[in-house]
């Protein structure tokens, strides 16, 4: 087998790593829908899904079967091509955003030097999917939900990017592995506390999760921009939202909590435990907080998050200048 040169083996191993990591992310996103319902039941002192399988363990399988066999309906007056492309773009952009996250020192799909910029680009690409879905559905509620979602996402992406600039300045790199290695002695959550708070808030908003789920507000917009979707097209939006939660949780761990670093246990175990903790925090936030009005969400972003990110940047710049001068 002369074609198995070291370069070919390296390429095959890289492809295998990418497939394994992305399959695990998709599985986590799918399983989180079941885990969320069980945890919400626990938080609200009621039963979660407990009928299919032992203790409801097969509920996810039942949901997948139902979704596969539902009619894949397309509205009569919709733009069929864009209507079909929108969920694919949403799912793919959220999945690709995880590609830059180093799960361990050797396991990362794409160790890019512009890792953070790539994440921001993928987050921005998701806005197009939402706009495509709302406009192509030819439904006023879908369009209103898409307009809300695009305005909210674009606004909070400003704070998302600014909250990361302090981390980039401290590490001197946009590369995620370099940022993790820079936290060997002190996690970024301590010197970049305001950046962490703002990034976590903006991450919830960009994922359109409660309490920032106004684009999908059932009481006002009848489920928003994916009201006309059914079957696997709706499934791509549904699983994509949970993949977004997994990705944002993994980024919080990587950027502010030392990534895979920790004593005794293997690196990927530490990474998985930290990520699972923040995924549970997403669910706890949904269980604990009410949904504010849309104007309150936008006002909170520009009047609270933006000043916090600017203060964080100024303090970080001052500290770096002081350390350089010393």
Swiss-Prot record:
Statement: the UniProt record of this protein carries the keyword Ribosomal protein: no
Location in the cell: Cell inner membrane
BP GO annotations: aerobic respiration
EC number(s) on file: 7.1.1.-
GO molecular function: NADH dehydrogenase activity; oxidoreductase activity, acting on NAD(P)H, quinone or similar compound as acceptor; quinone binding
Top EC class for this record: translocase
Bilayer topology term: Multi-pass membrane protein
The keyword Membrane is annotated on this UniProt entry: yes
Domain of life: Bacteria
Known function: NDH-1 shuttles electrons from NADH, via FMN and iron-sulfur (Fe-S) centers, to quinones in the respiratory chain. The immediate electron acceptor for the enzyme in this species is believed to be ubiquinone. Couples the redox reaction to proton translocation (for every two electrons transferred, four hydrogen ions are translocated across the cytoplasmic membrane), and thus conserves the redox energy in a proton gradient. This subunit may bind ubiquinone.
Protein name: NADH-quinone oxidoreductase subunit H
Lineage: Bacteria, Pseudomonadati, Pseudomonadota, Gammaproteobacteria, Enterobacterales
Gene: nuoH
């Amino acid at each position: 087998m002369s074609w198995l040169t070291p370069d070919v083996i390296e390429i095959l191993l890289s492809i295998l790593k990418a497939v394994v990591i992305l399959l695990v992310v998709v599985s986590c996103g799918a399983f989180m829908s079941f885990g969320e319902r069980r945890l919400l039941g626990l938080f609200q002192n009621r039963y979660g899904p407990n009928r299919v399988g032992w203790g409801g363990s097969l509920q996810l399988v039942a949901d997948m079967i139902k979704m596969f066999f539902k009619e894949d309906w397309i509205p009569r007056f919709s733009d069929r091509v864009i209507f079909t492309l929108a969920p694919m773009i949403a799912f793919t952009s959220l999945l690709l955003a995880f590609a830059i996250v180093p799960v361990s020192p050797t396991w990362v799909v794409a160790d890019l030097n512009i890792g953070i910029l790539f994440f921001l680009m993928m987050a921005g690409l998701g806005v197009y999917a939402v706009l495509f879905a709302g406009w192509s559905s030819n439904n006023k509620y879908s369009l209103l939900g898409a307009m809300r979602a695009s305005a909210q996402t674009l606004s909070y992406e400003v704070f998302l990017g600014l909250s990361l600039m302090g981390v980039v300045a401290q590490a001197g790199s946009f590369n995620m592995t370099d940022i993790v290695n820079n936290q060997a002695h002190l996690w970024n959550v301590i010197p970049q506390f305001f950046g962490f708070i703002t990034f976590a808030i903006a991450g919830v908003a960009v994922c359109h999760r409660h309490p920032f789920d106004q684009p999908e507000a059932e009481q006002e917009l009848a489920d928003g921009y994916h009201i006309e979707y059914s079957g696997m097209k709706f499934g791509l939006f549904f699983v994509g939202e949970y993949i977004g939660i997994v990705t944002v949780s993994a980024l919080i761990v990587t950027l502010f909590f030392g990534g895979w670093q920790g004593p005794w246990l293997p690196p990927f175990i530490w990474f998985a435990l930290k990520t699972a903790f923040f995924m549970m925090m997403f669910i706890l936030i949904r269980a604990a907080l009410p949904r504010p009005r849309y104007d309150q969400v936008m006002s909170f972003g520009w009047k609270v998050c933006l000043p916090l990110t600017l203060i964080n940047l100024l303090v970080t710049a001052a500290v770096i200048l002081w350390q350089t001068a010393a």
